[in-house]
């Protein structure tokens, strides 16, 4: 079942992928040239220029499925996946924390961010009874609360 929505320009659906397909695409050479270009721009021109170039990469909606544009009205289903960003890390810090993050039982996916100075950690969360919130307000409240707890957990775990 393909349930993660992939967007171009952050709003337009271009594909749906499984978790395995996403991990494979990130690990393969599919986006390597574009990511290397972003890292080069970051090193040569700075963060602002790199952020502009980064917008050209497809975006993955880990938290929800959408039909059409990425808007509240087009949200089909909340998936409960939360993305934790840890940014502004040195190469040494990245090398130190990646094994820690990979070893955490909550981590589903982890990858180095496009600029090469941070990590993106994908974790799945749900209520104790394995259900997920359904209304937009329940989703917003749940997502915020769980994100806050998980960001704190990973910060403590990685000692950052």
Where are the model-predicted features located?
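Short, surface-exposed ligand-recognition loops at beta-strand->loop->(often short) alpha-helix junctions
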Residues: 85-94
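Catalytic micro-motifs at enzyme active sites that drive phosphoryl/nucleotidyl and oxygen chemistry
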Residues: 69-74, 98-114, 159-160
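DNA replication initiation on ssDNA origins
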Residues: 1-80
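Helical (often loop-to-helix) elements that flank the catalytic cores of nucleotide-handling enzymes
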Residues: 97-103, 125-158
